[in-house]
Amino acid sequence: MKASPHRPTKALIHLGAIRQNIQQMGAHIPQGTLKWAVVKANAYGHGAVAVAKAIQDDVDGFCVSNIDEAIELRQAGLSKPILILGVSEIEAVALAKEYDFTLTVAGLEWIQALLDKEVDLTGLTVHLKIDSGMGRIGFREVSEVEQAQDLLQKHGVCVEGIFTHFATADEESDDYFNAQLERFKTILASMKEVPELVHASNSATTLWHVETIFNAVRMGDAMYGLNPSGAVLDLPYDLIPALTLESALVHVKTVPAGACMGYGATYQADSEQVIATVPIGYADGWTRDMQNFSVLVDGQACPIVGRVSMDQITIRLPKLYPLGTKVTLIGSNGDKEITATQVATYRVTINYEVVCLLSDRIPREYY
């Protein structure tokens, strides 16, 4: 989707806030711990290349979801190590070697498929993924882990790391987290040779389970100033939200009682009202279920009336405002603030999804 810079709708990204969040997290983890910045999904909607360039001196490497995201970073001139967290296509091995990426290996079948195709693995670097209870990808038995390690090393692969991912690190109960941790530790203790890099800490683990950090952490949601638990757990220290979502009034009118708004005529004015149009809609990631949520104009909460359209929303104003008046959808306006977590709560989802859904049609502006 092509960006629309000639619209007033934009996402403002505070790169300094991201750097401060990295420094804040770094100050609360053991000295010498490697810091990997997770910039998958366009850096959680913040812009992968711009974010990675801004923080490259603050981190030891980057994590992405797939090889195309990794290629984007290399082609932008970023030289730090890049770990691809997902399972890559067999055909991607040559690209991984060419661009010096680190691949995730999650199963013996994948390795065997490479060997069956006689793919040259010499010089490839990998991390082994352990499924300690997340249930998506990874080895579950130590015998499989050691078999994979032996096969890979026999064919010239550098098995640099081993990692897992926790399913409930951002929840109040530690029971399942501790069970996963023990399973991961058991596998490590049973291995004849543990790879150099061992990491299990995502943002939530880094924040609330610092005592369980191995020798590297993966900084994701929290790096962007978001609370991984939403509103379930309090942050142990301050983080600065890096993203503000803004637009402006493009049409303002006074309507009589009985006037209807939007598809389905789901809103009807019960009195004379001031209604304004804002150019953002579900094609931008401001989803259709946001009817009745409020945005901020002149420091005041103004409800979205009528259904969210593909490109526009209508809001009710307390009075007439001139065209071009700023509208804040996420961020501060006057003495009020709307957070990504508040948007997520209204949608019955998580703040990760709110920022990741902001489409490429919204220009990102950096400061």
From Swiss-Prot:
Keywords tagged on the record: Isomerase, Pyridoxal phosphate
Pathway: Amino-acid biosynthesis; D-alanine biosynthesis; D-alanine from L-alanine: step 1/1
GO molecular function: alanine racemase activity; pyridoxal phosphate binding
Highest taxon of the lineage: Bacteria
Top EC category: isomerase
Keyword set includes Isomerase: yes
One Gene Ontology cellular component annotation held by this UniProt entry: cytosol
EC number: 5.1.1.1
CC cofactor: pyridoxal 5'-phosphate
Active site (record annotation): K40, Y263
GO biological process, one term: peptidoglycan biosynthetic process
Modified residues (N6-(pyridoxal phosphate)lysine): K40
Positions of substrate binding: R136, M310
Annotated catalysed reactions: L-alanine = D-alanine
Family per similarity comment: Belongs to the alanine racemase family.
Function noted in UniProt: Catalyzes the interconversion of L-alanine and D-alanine. May also act on other amino acids.
HAMAP family the record matches: Ala_racemase
NCBIfam families reported in the protein's UniProt record: alr
Protein name: Alanine racemase
Species in which this protein is naturally found: Streptococcus pneumoniae (strain 70585)
